[in-house]
């Protein structure tokens, strides 16, 4: 929910921030993939390696999507100017149910209770259904987004 002060609209939050906290479930999984998982990114459950990984271009099954990587407070990684991610082998906090702030690459068509999609080519969230995977049980909470392309989405029920 965005705040307003003297005609100014405040940001909704930051990528990966949990919002509206009373009803949420967060699970901890190892990053078993070879890629970094940015805060606020969708994650795939890897049953073979018993952990989560970032979305890859070869992914096409939405049922593999289990949640969104939660932002945590700490020092950024020194190898990247935007070093806010979980590296391979680290424990990833994953929102399994609840509301979280995400960055959307396409804001066209965002509507309250509208379906959230994931683009497998870059692992980013979008509101566009064409050639994208529907994130299971996940909707845009308010249909709003701020100047930083941040939207609130709600995962209605856990899938793992």
Residue ranges: model-predicted function:
Residues 1-160:
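Surface-exposed, low-hydrophobicity beta-strand/loop segments enriched in small/polar/acidic residues
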